[in-house]
Design a protein with these regions (language model features):
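S-adenosyl-L-methionine-dependent methyltransferase catalytic core, i.e., the SAM/SAH-binding region
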Residues: 1-146
Length: 146
């Protein structure tokens, strides 16, 4: 969906409220490619769910709270299912903030609240994905509080 498509959606919304799933589908259907319609609609509904439930704010709050509730040596294990979540979690675990910028002390030493337990993200095996197709997008990250 390009910016002109989005502006058309916004203008249409100004004239007619979106009150049902049918209204929403009618509005976005012209922008879905026939071969990618299912994927496009899944992403659109995922975006709606994330926004309506304020999931990114909730994830940020939870991660920030771990700094107070975890004792040194305590482990934080997080499974993410899409790139927005994963980027937040990855940056937070590696740097202690959501932007991914490391804090340094007076001497230039990087200050991070966590140590990554695994250097690489853990993803499901081919066998797991075959048994459970919904696991295909899952990423597991483990960090230990310093």
């Amino acid at each position: 969906v390009c910016s002109s498509d989005l502006s058309l959606i916004v203008r249409t919304r100004e004239n007619k409220k979106i009150e049902t799933i049918g209204d929403f589908l009618e509005l976005v259907k012209p922008f879905t490619g026939k071969d990618k319609e299912k994927k496009f609609l899944a992403q659109a509904f995922q975006a709606l769910r994330i926004e309506v439930n304020d999931e990114m704010r909730a994830l940020k709050e939870m991660l920030q709270q771990t700094l107070q509730v975890l004792k040194p040596g305590g482990r934080l294990v997080v499974i993410t299912y899409h790139s927005l979540e994963d980027r937040l979690v990855k940056n937070f675990l590696k740097t202690g903030n959501f932007e991914g910028k490391s804090e340094q002390d007076f001497f230039g030493n990087v200050q991070t609240p966590f140590r990554m337990v695994n250097n690489k993200v853990i993803v499901p095996s081919d066998e797991e994905i075959e048994r459970n197709p919904r696991s295909r997008s899952a990423k597991l990250r483990i960090a230990e509080k310093k």
